[in-house]
Amino acid sequence: MYIGTSTGFFDLDEVKFIIIKDHFAEIKFMTFNYNHNSEIFEITEESFDEFLKENDTNFIKLSQKNKFSNTKTVFYVNCDKIACFINDKTYNITIKFKKSYFEDKEDTLYVDLKLNDLEFEMIKAKIAKDKKFVNI
């Protein structure tokens, strides 16, 4: 599925994650080489939330409040691109992504957010949707 914005369009299936801050989104893709695998688009949190609500997408939303300003950063993560999700209650969330053919190393995303057990189980259920998933 392609998404059009006022500044361009992109294939949602090729997105690893989207970071929205102040109406601008940095979008990290699977298909570019490692030196150039992200682009900036003008997207608001509200418009992307509305899009996710209206369409069947496999993204999770995580928000962190910025410590030194009255703003927040919103992360939308493509569940199909996640290789590892760690909910470290002491520090933060660490998400490692699957490597694409073009990359030498994997991307890692750190979110300064602590999930409670229920929130973590809900995210785990969404990530595990349509996949073989075993708890040990």
Describe the function of each predicted region.
Residues 1-136:
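Eukaryotic intrinsically disordered, low-complexity regulatory linkers and tails enriched in Ser/Thr/Pro
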